[in-house]
């Protein structure tokens, strides 16, 4: 049996990470790949479109009902979705109580011990990326995920999160085999977005794997709890996800050790691309507005 490809999608909350990952994985199945998704986001929305349902019951919530995780069976937590993709959500605690990363650690250990990784070509971790704390870094830190794909956009906070995630990868790249597979830009139609995404990828010693164009068909599919590949398989957007899946499939062993940049360098980059303004520019604009009002 060939080695399992263990990949992870990281990205800041609200960037479209779970939507992008599920559409990409649905396209990977078309390439004949067997897939297990492990959702590592407390929102537990990493498998919704694959299962065509509301959020899946999580390992932590089921363990709480059963008494402990040892009282669970694999079939309690693992559901089969679109084209037999295996789906698991690790879950998290109530807001303000405990560490959400604990669910990730508990889930991965349980799944490995109970044979969930048997007979799959890919394991995909869908991970919250605003905070690269110990728990959320678990797939990286414990040498589970080998290829990290960062979902980002041309917005400042998405770029900031992408750079932070690169720092997390760098921290563990020396002790394990984890590498940055590349950046995936989810178009938000900001100024010079494609150029900026390519420039950041280059600065991080990586590449822009794919630029996913914005298309309302994604929202139409989501409202029906489906991936675009299921909802509109012949659409241009479905083909974008197929192209992204093909690029990831052909990217095995091509990941890099990232070179994250400082906050100052990131701000300089944003100034260079006209996304941020200098203090002088902002003062000049303010003076012009005040002058216009005075007239």
UniProtKB/Swiss-Prot annotation:
ATP binds at residues 11-18. Binds 1 [4Fe-4S] cluster per dimer. Keywords: 4Fe-4S, ADP-ribosylation, ATP-binding, Iron, Iron-sulfur, Metal-binding, Nitrogen fixation, Nucleotide-binding, Oxidoreductase. Its cofactor is [4Fe-4S] cluster. It catalyses: N2 + 8 reduced [2Fe-2S]-[ferredoxin] + 16 ATP + 16 H2O = H2 + 8 oxidized [2Fe-2S]-[ferredoxin] + 2 NH4(+) + 16 ADP + 16 phosphate + 6 H(+). InterPro entries: NifH/chlL_CS, NifH/frxC, Nitrogenase_Fe_NifH, P-loop_NTPase. [4Fe-4S] cluster binds at residues 99, 133. Belongs to the NifH/BchL/ChlL family. Homodimer. This is Nitrogenase iron protein. It comes from Zymomonas mobilis subsp. mobilis (strain ATCC 31821 / ZM4 / CP4).
């Amino acid at each position: 049996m060939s080695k399992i490809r263990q990949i992870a999608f990281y990205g800041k909350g609200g960037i479209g990470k779970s939507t992008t990952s599920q559409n990409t994985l649905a396209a990977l199945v078309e390439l004949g790949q067997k897939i297990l998704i492990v959702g590592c986001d407390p929102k537990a929305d990493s498998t919704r479109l694959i299962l065509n349902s509301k959020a899946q019951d999580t390992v932590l919530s089921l363990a709480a009902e059963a008494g402990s995780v040892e009282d669970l069976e694999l079939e309690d937590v693992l559901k089969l979705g679109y084209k037999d993709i295996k789906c698991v959500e690790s879950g998290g605690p109530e807001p303000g109580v405990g560490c959400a990363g604990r669910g990730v650690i508990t889930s991965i250990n349980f799944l490995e011990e109970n044979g969930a990784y048997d007979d799959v070509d890919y394991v995909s971790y869908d991970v919250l990326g605003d905070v690269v704390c110990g728990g959320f870094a678990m797939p990286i830190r414990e040498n589970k995920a080998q290829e990290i794909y960062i979902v980002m956009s041309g917005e400042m906070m998405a770029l900031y999160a992408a750079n932070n995630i690169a720092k997390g990868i760098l921290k563990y790249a020396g002790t394990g085999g984890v590498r940055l597979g590349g950046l995936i830009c989810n178009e938000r139609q900001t100024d010079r977005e494609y150029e900026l995404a390519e420039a950041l990828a280059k600065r991080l010693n990586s590449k822009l794997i794919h630029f996913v164009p914005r298309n309302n068909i994604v929202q139409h599919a989501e409202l029906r709890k489906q991936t675009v590949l299921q909802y509109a398989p012949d659409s241009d957007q479905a083909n974008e996800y197929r192209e992204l899946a093909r690029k990831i499939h052909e990217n095995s062993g091509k990941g890099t050790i990232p070179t994250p940049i400082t906050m100052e360098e990131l701000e300089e980059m944003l100034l260079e691309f006209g996304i941020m303004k200098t203090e002088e520019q902002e003062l000049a604009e303010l003076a012009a507005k005040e002058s216009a009002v005075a007239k």
